[in-house]
Regions:
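Outer-membrane beta-barrel porins/channels
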Residues: 1-239
Length: 239
């Protein structure tokens, strides 16, 4: 007796929506970026061309959201979003995708004593996440060199894998069975892509010119970021 089957199974669901907003008088998005730049020891131009500085910090420097200023005769690193005493903050992250496995299986019974089975699985993965973050001045002061900043990020990962499973059941008696199963290592080949952008309105900072500036990640990397490709292996097992 022989059995052949085809199956499509949803192994994981990544769909998620995360939204929150509120007011903050303690910290800002740009604060850790300013700390990173300050600890690097670089000038602004050197930081913009360094691989040791994160892309987000470079975007903050490019738009003058993070800058240097002379305060009480000392040159210091500043984050302009820390100037207002109160900030409106909002975060919106939308994630979609999942992992679906397509499998092909076959089973065979021999002499009512041996039962053999095998399956090939092809998991297909996709996850996509769009993130938007915004901070704005909640004080109403139009002359403190910060109106708002907005950061957006797009991340995508896709991949396909392979696995194999085989099993044997031996039934010498109706009431007695011996079984053995072999699960091959799971092999996944994945590709990731990423891009981001940041905009800041610094009000009268460059008056009479506009205080608004924006930058895409591709501007700082000389073009779209290369896709990241890698393989993921999980151990096989014998049961």
């Amino acid at each position: 007796e022989e059995l052949v089957a085809h199956c499509r199974t949803r192994l994981a669901n990544f769909n998620q929506s995360l939204i929150y907003n509120g007011q903050n008088d303690y910290s800002s998005f740009a604060e850790p970026l300013a700390d990173e730049f300050a600890s690097s020891g670089y000038t602004i131009d050197a930081a913009l061309n360094s691989n040791d500085v994160s892309l987000t910090t470079k975007m903050a420097l490019y738009t003058y959201l993070v800058d240097t200023a002379t305060i009480n005769g000392t040159n210091k690193v500043i984050a302009r979003s820390e100037f207002p005493a109160l900030l409106n903050q909002e975060h919106n992250s939308q994630t979609s995708g999942g992992i679906t496995e397509i499998s092909f299986s076959m089973g065979h019974e021999l002499n009512k004593k041996f039962m053999l089975g095998a399956s090939i699985g092809i998991p297909i993965a996709k996850i996509e996440r769009n993130t938007y973050y915004r901070e704005s001045d909640a004080t109403g002061d139009a002359d403190n060199d910060f109106s708002y900043m907005a950061y957006r990020e797009h991340y995508k990962a896709t991949g396909v894998g392979f696995n194999f499973k085989a099993g044997l059941i031996y039934r010498p008696k109706e009431y007695f069975r011996l079984g053995l199963a072999l699960h091959s290592p799971h092999i996944f080949m994945l590709k990731e892509s990423f891009d981001a952008g940041l905009a800041a309105d610094l009000e009268q900072l460059f008056s009479p010119n506009t205080g608004f500036d924006s930058v895409a990640s591709s501007t700082l990397t000389g073009g779209p970021l290369d896709d990241t490709r890698y393989s993921l292996y999980t151990p096989g097992k014998i049961i």
